[in-house]
């Protein structure tokens, strides 16, 4: 790749990430896409999230039993899409109890403890995506 093409791609990626972060401040739900660990096919699913600073926190609804979480363990590439603006990042699985509890608290603050209890059944894993 020529230097000018590489520079343009980097600038486009930064612009897309900035646009994505702006949209993430306005929405309560996003779409993530991961590669199936067996099929290799792209799988997309709507999820709740918490944006804090340059980090996006995800909480699998069935903890470590959640299929998209298992896929991330096999291939950490994850596409984050907020209503038409999206890009691909690296997902970092979190299993440390204290760190997972911190993510759960962030979700309770954003969505309410009642809804987190209603929709989430296992609390042993989370995912962090560095957006910056």
Q: What are these model-predicted stretches?
A:
Residues 2-38:
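Short, conserved active-site entrance elements at the starts or edges of catalytic domains
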Residues 8-19, 42-53, 89:
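Charged, low-complexity, helix/coiled-coil-prone segments
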Residues 18, 25-26, 58, 89, ...:
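Residues at structural and domain junctions
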Residues 20-22, 57-70:
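Covalent nucleotidyltransferase core used to form phosphodiester bonds in nucleic acids
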Residues 24, 39-41, 72, 121:
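A generic structural micro-feature
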Residues 27-61, 78:
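Short beta-strand segments
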Residues 63-132:
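Short, structured beta-strand-loop surface elements
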């Amino acid at each position: 790749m020529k230097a000018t093409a590489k520079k343009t791609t980097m600038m486009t990626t930064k612009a897309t990430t900035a646009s994505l972060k702006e949209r993430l401040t306005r929405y309560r739900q996003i779409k993530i896409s991961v590669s199936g660990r067996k099929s290799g096919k792209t799988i997309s699913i709507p999820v709740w999230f918490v944006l804090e600073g340059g980090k996006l926190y995800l909480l699998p609804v069935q903890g470590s039993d959640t299929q998209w979480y298992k896929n991330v363990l096999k291939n950490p590439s994850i596409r984050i899409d907020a209503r038409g603006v999206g890009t691909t990042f690296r997902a970092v699985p979190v299993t440390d109890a204290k760190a997972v509890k911190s993510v759960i608290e962030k979700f309770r603050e954003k969505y309410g403890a009642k809804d987190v209890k209603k929709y989430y059944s296992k609390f042993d894993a989370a995912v962090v995506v560095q957006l910056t």
